[in-house]
């Protein structure tokens, strides 16, 4: 039902400020989830089960983190046909993020620029929201560091968040690739990443012993990486036996949107312009890690064919964000069906 209504809703939403439209949509989905209206909105998406990280996904098309930073609309989002939901990024303490305006549409390029800056209500409220959700599918919880935490102490924030979210997560994503938190991408460097992942894997094992279950860790990386950086990241993932990698976050490049309104705004660019760069990172990373570290492909998916290309590049699962904002829930079903056809061809 919602899929057929979305084109009409989008016309109104796209007349609003991008962030205001974002919040309005989340409030509506949150209300739908709380009142049971989500059942009426439920999308008809075929099952296409896939097992990755030891988890069985209803279908391989998920929602990327960033849309629901506080986990406040999980049930409403789950009704739209996604095979898995990822919420966050959340930080130890609440923070407002960067000053507004901080989200911009580039409709001529099917793109967004955002410099949100991990705005969220903190991990304690996040956990309460997750616990209140009725959704029992695969739920990824995405964690980051507070803006005022020195980069040298970033591991403390990640370890704190990991401990808080661990009992409630199907998997936990370590976000070290947002361009909107100062110096965060330094953590992708070989030495910094090695130290961070060593600490996280040690904490993961201790939490697994405490809770009686091993919750997989996924690392989210940037598209703005050279070949040597991709190789180093791949080696580090293998060395620490990280369960998955999400490729990729937003890009700082503006090559594909030069001259367009808002193109010079600071922040990360997402949508169609990041598709090729994301696929290239996926291909190179897959060449390094093979099947030992599953890849979740995200960046610029606007059609079922785009999702298929991501899998052909080496991804095991895909996630939607900007394409979902532009095309709505119909994109979820289209991607699932395209992937299912590919597997039966």
Swiss-Prot record:
Its EC number is 1.3.5.2. It is a peripheral membrane protein. It catalyses: (S)-dihydroorotate + a quinone = orotate + a quinol. Keywords: Cell membrane, Flavoprotein, FMN, Membrane, Oxidoreductase, Pyrimidine biosynthesis. Binds 1 FMN per subunit. Its cofactor is FMN. GO terms for cellular component: cytoplasm; plasma membrane. GO terms for molecular function: dihydroorotate dehydrogenase (quinone) activity. FMN binds at residues 65-69, 89, 142, 175, 220, 248, 271, 300, 321-322. The keyword rRNA-binding does not apply. Pfam families: DHO_dh (PF01180). The keyword Transferase does not apply. GO terms for biological process: 'de novo' pyrimidine nucleobase biosynthetic process; 'de novo' UMP biosynthetic process. It is found in: Cell membrane. The active site is at residue 178. Substrate binds at residues 69, 114-118, 175, 180, 249-250. It comes from the Bacteria. Pathway: Pyrimidine metabolism; UMP biosynthesis via de novo pathway; orotate from (S)-dihydroorotate (quinone route): step 1/1. Belongs to the dihydroorotate dehydrogenase family. Type 2 subfamily. Catalyzes the conversion of dihydroorotate to orotate with quinone as electron acceptor. Monomer. This is Dihydroorotate dehydrogenase (quinone). It comes from Burkholderia ambifaria (strain ATCC BAA-244 / DSM 16087 / CCUG 44356 / LMG 19182 / AMMD). The lineage of its organism: Bacteria, Pseudomonadati, Pseudomonadota, Betaproteobacteria, Burkholderiales.
């Amino acid at each position: 039902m919602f899929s057929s209504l979305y084109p009409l809703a989008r016309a109104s939403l796209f007349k609003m400020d991008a962030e205001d439209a974002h919040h309005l949509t989340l409030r509506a989905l949150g209300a739908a989830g709380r009142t049971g209206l989500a059942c009426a909105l439920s999308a008809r998406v075929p099952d296409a089960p896939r097992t990755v990280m030891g988890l069985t996904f209803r279908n391989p098309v998920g929602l990327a983190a960033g849309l629901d930073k506080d986990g406040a609309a999980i049930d409403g989002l789950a009704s739209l046909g996604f095979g898995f939901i990822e919420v966050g990024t959340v930080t130890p303490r609440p923070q407002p993020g960067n000053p507004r305006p901080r989200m911009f549409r580039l409709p001529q390029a099917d793109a967004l620029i955002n410099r949100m800056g991990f705005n969220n209500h903190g991990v304690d409220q996040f956990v309460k929201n997750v616990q209140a959700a009725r959704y029992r599918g695969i739920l990824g919880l995405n964690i980051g560091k507070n803006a005022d935490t020195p980069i040298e102490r970033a591991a403390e924030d990640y370890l704190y968040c990991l401990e808080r979210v661990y009992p409630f997560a199907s998997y936990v994503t370590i976000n070290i690739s947002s361009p909107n938190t100062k110096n965060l991408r330094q953590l992708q460097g070989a030495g910094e990443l090695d130290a961070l992942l060593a600490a996280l894997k040690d904490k993961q094992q201790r939490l697994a012993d405490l809770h009686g279950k091993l919750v997989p860790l996924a690392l989210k990386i940037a598209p703005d990486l050279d070949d040597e950086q991709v190789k180093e990241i791949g080696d580090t993932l293998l060395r620490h036996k990280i369960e998955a990698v999400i490729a990729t976050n937003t890009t700082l490049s503006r090559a594909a949107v030069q001259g367009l309104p808002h193109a010079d705004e600071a922040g990360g660019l997402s949508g169609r312009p990041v598709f090729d760069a994301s696929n290239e990172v996926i291909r190179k990373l897959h060449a390094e890690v093979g099947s030992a570290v599953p890849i979740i492909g995200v960046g610029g998916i606007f059609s079922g064919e785009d999702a298929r290309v991501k899998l052909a590049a080496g991804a095991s699962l895909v996630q939607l964000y900007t394409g979902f904002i532009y095309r709505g829930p119909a994109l979820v079903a289209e991607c699932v069906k395209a992937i299912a056809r590919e597997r039966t061809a």
